[in-house]
Amino acid sequence: MSDSQTLVVKLGTSVLTGGSRRLNRAHIVELVRQCAQLHAAGHRIVIVTSGAIAAGREHLGYPELPATIASKQLLAAVGQSRLIQLWEQLFSIYGIHIGQMLLTRADMEDRERFLNARDTLRALLDNHIVPVINENDAVATAEIKVGDNDNLSALAAILAGADKLLLLTDQQGLFTADPRSNPQAELIKDVYGVDDALRSIAGDSVSGLGTGGMSTKLQAADVACRAGIDTIIASGSKPGVIGDVMEGISVGTRFHAQASPLENRKRWIFGAPPAGEITVDEGATAAMLERGSSLLPKGIKSVTGNFSRGEVIRICNLQGRDIAHGVSRYNSDALRRIAGHHSQQIDAILGYEYGPVAVHRDDMITR
């Protein structure tokens, strides 16, 4: 249909469990019903699901396990199959097929893998199949994890070319303060840009079952909106919430998409989880933010992490604030060696060069 839209729905652990230790199947049935109704109307639906660890813990009878990464991955390995079976069973009631996609950060960092994931996701949608996406928690290490399903959902929205991203949670939306401890807190209904003031009031969820809080939802909204995707944070327990969002009814907190969205390559740069981090001096900060300049080695103060040439890195100012993301022209070891030096010295220091800049302005997104 001509007015068909693509919606990515992220379902957090607190929504799927209702705050308990087990999946709330009755509630999941209702969420699937809403999605199926939209699917029947010609809309394209993508599910980003949490809950694998909770499903694994329930299936194994809530075993007492040490609080280690291995234990979580054990539970995820058991729970992931149970979770996907549940989604398949419920969507099949409406004659809808699903397709599972397990992603890691590596799928987003590498441009070719990013494009492959995009093509797979869009092929599923083109064939009226509902993609069900989760991070591959059973094998992902800290180095290759996106980290939380909020940011994963923003990346999925970019991959899908979505019109809207809906982050369902156990809160009504983003408030001026934590409503659990401050009765004067007010719901923020509309946001037209994520800034430091907004970041400072985004407290973390008290749910012990998931990995994302309100701060990660804010990060996801920022990424999606700058890619031209409206983002809504709303309560997963609100009746008819998914349909309301598609109809444009005001629910929760709406983050309005940037009027001039990033072009495709820069969407990838902005959305890709950084492989490392560099800190730059005040001169470099001003040059990038005020004049749109490339980053020269001279302005680099320190390099954190190990990354390859061509990977996306985070650029921070001296106060530790994330000011830009960009594709590094040099690997981390090379950047450490040329940091603080003039560009004319690169060849003498390294014995080779890939140009005078560390990060070119055409491969950079300022925040």
UniProtKB/Swiss-Prot annotation:
Q: Where in the cell is it found?
A: Cytoplasm
| UniProt entry keywords in alphabetical sequence | Amino-acid biosynthesis, ATP-binding, Cytoplasm, Kinase, Nucleotide-binding, Proline biosynthesis, Transferase
Where does the PUA domain start and stop, copy by copy? 275-353
This enzyme catalyses:
L-glutamate + ATP = L-glutamyl 5-phosphate + ADP
- Could you say which EC number(s) this protein's record lists? 2.7.2.11
Q: List GO BP terms, alphabetically.
A: L-proline biosynthetic process; proline biosynthetic process
What this protein is called in its record is Glutamate 5-kinase
